[in-house]
């Protein structure tokens, strides 16, 4: 074997072996326990980033280690290939999105293969493949038939840059999740999926403390995020009667303004009502009120999510309309509020300024009445300053509430609900924050919605025999809306009902549809006759339940998908279950949300106020006296908006943040692999931090990982020079190891190796891969420190120890482990490392002939003594008093007492 570690040659040899043996192709095997582990499929943006490397290495370590432990493991990969970035890239480069997408897939696949990932590429899927999205269309039609999918017109989030509708979950702080553009409100028809029909089950399975919860293998943070998003609220829905009539003389909404509240105990404190800009009362008032109409138009510029509204300033305008308080008969003014959503509840809220912080601020701003109706003992109400106790329903008692005064929250709600019910104006009701999923997108590069619009027959589903409705592959967007709307070859079709000329639906499906079930398609990817089949039953089965339960054993991805993708995938799975396609209730048994990869961020404002970002390799830190980073400066000339900046130019240090192209703080995995090798990249990302925590990039630590692998290689070279045949034969069988005569040093080595192995095995089970690597480092230290190599027992201990190290390292650094395993002859006796058995802790190796005990004198550590493992108290005491360390630190004083902590220490009091 080569004397020096050459990562390029090592990795080439490993890949050749794996490719020749089709190493990672897997089939169903009922004789083995199955384990399905999957990373969230990537968008083919062009290149992998370090977050990908970390995610996929975590998955790879898991599947490789379990394969060694006898599991039938599946690690597939695919591409979330539809989406707006492809259209934008096509617009920029003048090429069809399909070409851009497939070119990127080819490059990123090569990068993944270079990483040595144990992916079964025979199961690869791309969501832009008609053979894949045919089943999106097929299931959509099944949902349409069952009433789960439907069409309606509704106020939606409109991204003015991407010219498309966004789901609520895709609006972050009032901006589009992809473009960052301020979202607008628009009324537009589209298709929706009734995820709300599954709200209770979605909540039950994820809710912490719920006896029906099944997702106990998910992080609590993710479970809580989903629970809050689903948002179950118990309260009272009631009406404010009115006699407001439209131009035809009819009462608007039958003369009732409905609201929902969880604080019915404060109903006697209502001083105004607020309605959404789209509410019928608002529209009626605006018809004869120009300033109000202008205000409503201004409101449409905001987004339609609670998160967006929570951040914006609360504004309103009176309508001049009044409704009647259902219990007091008082007239209550109706306002239009920019913070009220038509899509939530009835599009109206009651205003109780005294006991709602938002209403309090609104009332102060517009000088509206504030009426206190809840009192907390010992507190004083201030009409000019909000205090937290104003909204305290646990300690509060109702006041100024006529017959409802003196009641606790629970009693007041019950009494108010009863009074409203008697008047026919209200009832107890449960509401949900979750809204139906709008899947229509006014874009080209997505799954065509399989609907045909006929002037005679209306919206007609595409017949199943005509699926898939294939997306044209050669269109190039020009930036002016959806290209499908201008593609006559796609648009023109005969109505399947009447045969007359008709037009296809030009909206495409939200790309989150594609990612809601791809993990099931991996199980049976080539099936042209069914969406899922027997392979899905095998891989997506809960091994602890005959039916129901959860499917995939381990799912890995970022916490940024906690609401969007993960909630949709859960819903999609339940729909497929109800259609008889799968047997599980939930898609993912366990979820790991890996931490982000961080790096330093450096910037500088240009003369025009723009911000330039600089690559870390062009910058050096400036430190204060305490060694803290206080700034930075250029160590290489760098381009900026002000031209070429010279060495020494001061640069702002922004701390660490997620690696990002826009901030020039990313690390190219390809360059890392070329310089150090895939094993170094993998090892570094696993060693630096536990999988669930953030990883802060450190170039010096990358060098350290590379040096460690050189040490492992060099030790392998050392072993190659000795006669290993007899030792390998002994290591190959546990029984023959019992016949080996191990000397004192060899026993000590085996004790260290097997002690570390025991901990490493536990760490693998916990997926604490950083401490797995730490354990491997302890093993190489012990092997390097071992000097007695002249006996048969010593050689067996070395060969056994290094063989254990290679198997421990193999899931993390498979290339170097494979080559050393082969070169040193382990494959000939223990089999190919691909399927070599996981090393077992040898009980006899953990038996100690001697113990090392810490020696204290008057409670202070002064040294150590070694005694026989069988030594009794008298022998230990004698050894302690006779030791040089005791004699030195006792300073001639006689011992008064000897305290022995078995197996740990001896304390001599003088």
Swiss-Prot record:
GO terms for cellular component: cytosol. One of its GO terms (molecular function) is ATP binding. Pfam families: Anticodon_1 (PF08264), tRNA-synt_1 (PF00133), tRNA-synt_1_2 (PF13603), tRNA-synt_1g (PF09334). Coiled coil: none annotated. Its main location: cytoplasm. Its EC number is 6.1.1.4. Keywords: Aminoacyl-tRNA synthetase, ATP-binding, Cytoplasm, Ligase, Nucleotide-binding, Protein biosynthesis. PROSITE patterns: AA_TRNA_LIGASE_I. GO terms for biological process: leucyl-tRNA aminoacylation. Transmembrane segments: none annotated. It catalyses: tRNA(Leu) + L-leucine + ATP = L-leucyl-tRNA(Leu) + AMP + diphosphate. A motif ('HIGH' region) lies at residues 42-52. ATP binds at residue 661. SUPFAM superfamilies: Anticodon-binding domain of a subclass of class I aminoacyl-tRNA synthetases (SSF47323), Nucleotidylyl transferase (SSF52374), ValRS/IleRS/LeuRS editing domain (SSF50677). The keyword Aminoacyl-tRNA synthetase applies. A motif ('KMSKS' region) lies at residues 658-662. The keyword Cytoplasm applies. Belongs to the class-I aminoacyl-tRNA synthetase family. This is Leucine--tRNA ligase. The lineage of its organism: Bacteria, Pseudomonadati, Pseudomonadota, Betaproteobacteria, Burkholderiales.
């Amino acid at each position: 074997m080569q004397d020096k570690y050459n990562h390029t040659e090592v990795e080439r040899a490993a890949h050749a072996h794996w490719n020749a043996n089709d190493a990672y192709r897997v089939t169903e095997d009922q004789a083995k326990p199955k384990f399905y582990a999957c990373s969230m499929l990537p968008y083919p943006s062009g290149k992998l980033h370090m977050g990908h490397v970390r995610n996929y290495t975590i998955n790879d370590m898991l599947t490789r280690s379990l394969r060694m432990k006898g599991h039938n493991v599946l690690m597939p990969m695919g591409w979330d290939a539809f989406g707006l970035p492809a259209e934008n890239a096509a617009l920029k480069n003048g090429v069809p999105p399909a070409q851009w997408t497939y070119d990127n897939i080819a490059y990123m696949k090569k990068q993944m293969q270079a990483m040595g990932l144990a992916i079964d590429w025979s199961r690869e899927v791309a969501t832009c493949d008609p053979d894949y999205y045919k089943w999106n269309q097929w299931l959509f039609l099944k949902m349409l038939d069952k009433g789960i999918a439907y069409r309606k017109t509704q106020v939606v989030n409109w991204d003015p840059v991407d010219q498309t509708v966004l789901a609520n979950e895709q609006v972050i702080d009032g901006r589009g999740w992809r473009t960052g553009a301020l979202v607008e409100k628009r009324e537009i028809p589209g298709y929706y999926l009734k995820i709300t029909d599954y709200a209770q089950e979605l909540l039950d399975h994820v809710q912490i403390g719920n006896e029906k919860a099944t997702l106990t293998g998910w992080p609590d943070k993710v479970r809580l995020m989903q629970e809050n998003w689903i948002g179950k609220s118990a309260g009272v829905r009631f009406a404010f009667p009115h006699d407001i009539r439209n131009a035809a003389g009819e009462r608007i909404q039958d003369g009732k303004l409905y609201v929902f509240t969880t604080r019915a105990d404060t109903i006697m404190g209502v001083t105004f009502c607020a309605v959404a800009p789209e509410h019928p009362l608002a529209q009626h008032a605006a018809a004869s009120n120009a300033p109000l109409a202008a205000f409503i138009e201004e409101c449409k510029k905001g987004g339609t999510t609670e998160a967006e509204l929570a951040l914006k300033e609360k504004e309103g305008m009176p309508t001049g309309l009044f409704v009647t308080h259902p219990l007091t008969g008082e007239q209550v003014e109706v306002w239009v509020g920019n913070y009220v959503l038509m899509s939530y509840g009835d599009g109206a809220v009651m205003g109780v300024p005294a006991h709602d912080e938002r209403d309090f601020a609104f009332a102060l701003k517009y000088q509206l009445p504030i009426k206190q109706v809840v009192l907390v003992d010992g507190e004083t109400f201030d009409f000019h300053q909000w205090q937290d106790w104003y909204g305290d329903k646990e300690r509060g008692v109702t006041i100024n509430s006529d017959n409802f005064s003196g009641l606790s929250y629970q009693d007041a709600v019950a009494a108010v609900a009863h009074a409203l019910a008697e008047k026919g104006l209200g009832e107890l009701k449960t509401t949900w924050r979750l809204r139906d999923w709008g899947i229509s997108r006014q874009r080209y590069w997505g799954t065509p919605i399989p609907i045909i619009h006929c002037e005679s027959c209306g919206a007609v589903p595409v017949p199943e025999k005509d699926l898939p409705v294939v997306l044209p592959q050669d269109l190039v967007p020009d930036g002016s809306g959806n290209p499908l709307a201008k593609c006559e070859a796609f648009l023109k079709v005969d109505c399947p009902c009447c045969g007359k000329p008709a037009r296809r639906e030009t909206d495409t499906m939200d790309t989150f549809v594609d990612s809601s079930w791809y993990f099931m398609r991996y199980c049976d990817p080539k099936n042209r006759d069914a969406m899922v089949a027997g392979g899905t039953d095998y891989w997506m089965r809960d091994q602890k339940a005959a039916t129901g339960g959860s499917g995939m054993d381990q799912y890995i991805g970022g916490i940024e998908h906690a609401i969007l993708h993960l909630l949709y995938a859960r819903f999609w799975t339940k729909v497929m279950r109800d259609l008889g396609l799968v047997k599980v209730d939930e898609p993912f048994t366990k979820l790991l949300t890996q931490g982000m990869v961080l790096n330093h961020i450096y910037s500088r404002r240009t003369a025009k106020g723009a911000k330039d970002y600089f690559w870390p390799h062009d910058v050096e830190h400036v430190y204060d006296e305490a060694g803290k980073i206080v700034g930075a400066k250029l160590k290489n000339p760098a381009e900026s908006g002000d031209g070429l900046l010279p060495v020494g130019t001061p640069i702002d240090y922004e701390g660490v943040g997620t690696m990002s192209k826009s901030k020039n703080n990313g690390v190219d995995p390809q360059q890392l692999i070329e310089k150090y090798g895939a094993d170094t990249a993998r090892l570094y990302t696993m060693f630096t931090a536990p999988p669930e925590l953030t990883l802060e990039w450190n170039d010096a630590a990358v060098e350290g990982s590379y040096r460690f692998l050189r040490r492992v290689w060099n030790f392998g070279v050392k072993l190659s020079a000795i006669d290993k045949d007899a030792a390998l034969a002994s290591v190959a069988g546990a029984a023959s190891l019992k016949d080996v005569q191990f000397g004192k040093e060899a026993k000590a080595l085996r004790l260290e190796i097997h002690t570390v192995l025991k901990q490493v095995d536990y760490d693998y089970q916990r997926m604490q891969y950083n401490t797995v690597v730490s354990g491997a480092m302890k093993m190489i230290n012990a092997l390097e420190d071992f000097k007695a190599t002249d006996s048969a027992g010593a050689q067996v201990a070395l060969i056994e120890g290094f063989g254990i190290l290679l198997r421990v390292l193999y899931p993390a650094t498979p290339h170097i482990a494979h080559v050393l395993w082969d070169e040193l002859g382990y494959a000939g006796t223990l089999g190919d490392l691909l399927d070599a058995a996981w090393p077992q802790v040898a009980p006899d190796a953990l038996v100690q002939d001697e113990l090392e005990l810490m020696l204290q004198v008057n409670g202070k550590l002064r040294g150590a003594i070694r005694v026989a493992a069988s030594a009794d108290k008298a022998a230990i005491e004698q050894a302690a008093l006779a030791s040089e360390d005791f004699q030195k630190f006792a300073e001639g004083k006689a011992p008064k007492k000897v305290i022995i902590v078995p197996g740990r220490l001896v304390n001599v009091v003088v």
